[in-house]
Amino acid sequence: MYSDVFCKVYNEFGWNYYPEIFGEQLLEWIKRNNLNVKSSLDLACGTGVLCEIMHDYGADAWGMDFSSGMIDIAKNRNGNIHYDVADMTVYRPDRKFDLVTCTGDAVNHIAELSDVEKIFENVYAYTAEGGYFVFDLLNENEVSDSEPFEMDFTDTMKVWFQMTRPAENKVNLCIRVFEEGKDTFEENIRETIHDPMAICQLLKKCGFSSVTCSDRLLSDAENHSTTWFVVAGK
């Protein structure tokens, strides 16, 4: 579970840009496919940015995240959206959704394919007939070791980011916080790179009838180079 410090950094340091960009493309994808999305669920929703976008679109938007700190921030941002603190491997709400999403390479936070399969089984159970599950995955060919990247957080606080590849199919994102020049906090987010073909096969095994994987959600949109987009229809 993310620490309170990381949740604050995530919320205030501009990491909303990805769900905002994805949300714009998702709404266009819904429009182009002539979908009637009355309900949506965002898994690993973080601070709830995509939930807010779907709420403003007019859907009955829900969100869930393993981190109570993220959900606290999401609830403070918009108290009209239903949020749950839960583990995706066991989360199975007693209702169905027209659209289920999971972004920010959250599936890559799950190390074992057996646990990914549990998530897919759950998602299939609460996806409505004719509904869709849309999520992203890290693209192995586009993820490599990086030099530390530093940004000012406040006048006295800096945040330092670095991505490394400690093993063949592993990624580590290190976040360090410096206050008045002192190293005060460090968090490491460990992810596993999954074979997109294996992921697509798992989705079909769990019952999804149509599965596609591409480097972009919209054919004419700029691709997000580190990401695969997977669309699974029920």
For every predicted segment, state its role:
Residues 198-234:
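C-terminal lobe and adjacent flexible extensions of AdoMet/dcAdoMet transferase-like proteins
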Residues 108-110:
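A short His-aromatic
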Residues 41, 48-90:
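Class I SAM-dependent methyltransferase SAM/SAH-binding core
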Residues 117-129:
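A short glycine-rich, Lys/Arg-flanked "PGG" loop and its adjoining helix->strand segment in the class I
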